[in-house]
């Protein structure tokens, strides 16, 4: 997999601090704090840890309190940034170049076609961007904030919507974030339990697992060819969500992947050998003690 995504345009932005905000309808959002500093980084350089962190946030949702879940999701966002749901959900991250936003089936928005301004309002609930749209024509002004202007200049070759995801007034709904982490952990659990208990399942149960796995998917990253020391494929990720989802998918399908589920604490971890079933000696000892009862 390293070779497959050796060349990737995957720079992302996280802020030094995020905060909770509630809109007029009582929905909670995570958004950069007013004085937070944007930090540009490459999430694919540490993709294994990022996927592991995402899975464990999702896995802990099943058993943890609301407070701990909120803390875990905020911790992930602080470490890696918001997921870029605005560019991940539509059929194309360049949706601003079209008359409307076209959306495949998803958990969050039922409409298949949506007015661009209405769609943007889902991600800018507090401070609207200075954005004008008329048919395919659009105009976006960034005024006053030199840091935001610098970010826009840095990512000027990317779709406008992706750059908007990096703005200080961009926000993502907490319940949408929570559902995304749930989906990832459900897929991971399904893949683990299917092969762990396959011999004990009837065919109807197997089909339920298969259907659940088949529903996992999303938009594929775009790519282009470049002539370097030799022709290379350059993959382009326009959202952190897509980067995580693609890396996770390849881990699941990779026969040599060391990604496992601890039989004791039910956390995801990477094994050092095929015989390992526990993330730590403490978990192994606790599991053995439990089985003695």
Sequence positions of predicted segments:
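Cysteine-rich micro-motifs
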Residues: 273-286
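Contiguous alpha-helical segments
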Residues: 287-293
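Short, charged low-complexity intrinsically disordered segments located at boundaries
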Residues: 219, 223, 276-279, 292
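Short helix-coil boundary/hinge micro-motifs
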Residues: 1-269
């Amino acid at each position: 997999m390293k070779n497959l995504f050796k060349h990737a345009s995957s720079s992302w932005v996280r802020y030094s601090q995020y905060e909770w905000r509630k809109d007029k309808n009582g929905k909670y959002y995570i958004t950069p704090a007013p004085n937070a500093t944007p930090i540009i980084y490459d999430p694919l350089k540490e993709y294994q840890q990022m996927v592991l962190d995402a899975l464990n946030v999702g896995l802990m949702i099943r058993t943890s309190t609301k407070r701990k879940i909120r803390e875990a999701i905020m911790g992930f966002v602080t470490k890696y940034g918001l997921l870029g749901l605005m560019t991940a959900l539509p059929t194309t991250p360049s949706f601003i170049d079209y008359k409307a936003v076209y959306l495949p089936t998803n958990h969050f928005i039922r409409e298949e076609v949506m007015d661009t301004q209405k769609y943007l309002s889902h991600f800018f609930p507090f401070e609207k961007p200075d954005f004008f749209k008329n048919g395919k024509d659009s105009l976006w002004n960034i005024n006053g904030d030199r840091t935001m202007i610098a970010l826009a200049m840095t990512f000027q070759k990317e779709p406008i919507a992706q750059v908007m995801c990096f703005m200080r007034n961009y926000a993502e709904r907490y319940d949408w974030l929570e559902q995304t982490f749930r989906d990832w952990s459900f897929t991971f659990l399904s893949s683990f339990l299917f092969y762990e208990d396959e011999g004990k399942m009837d065919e109807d149960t197997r089909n339920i697992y298969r259907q659940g796995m088949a529903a996992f998917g999303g938009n594929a990253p775009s790519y282009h060819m470049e002539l370097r020391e030799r022709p290379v494929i350059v993959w382009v990720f326009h959202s952190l969500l897509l980067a995580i989802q693609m890396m996770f998918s390849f881990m699941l399908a990779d026969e040599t992947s060391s990604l496992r589920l601890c039989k004791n604490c039910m956390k995801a971890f990477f094994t050092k050998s095929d015989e390992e079933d526990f993330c730590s000696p403490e978990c192994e000892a606790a599991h053995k003690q439990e089985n003695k009862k």
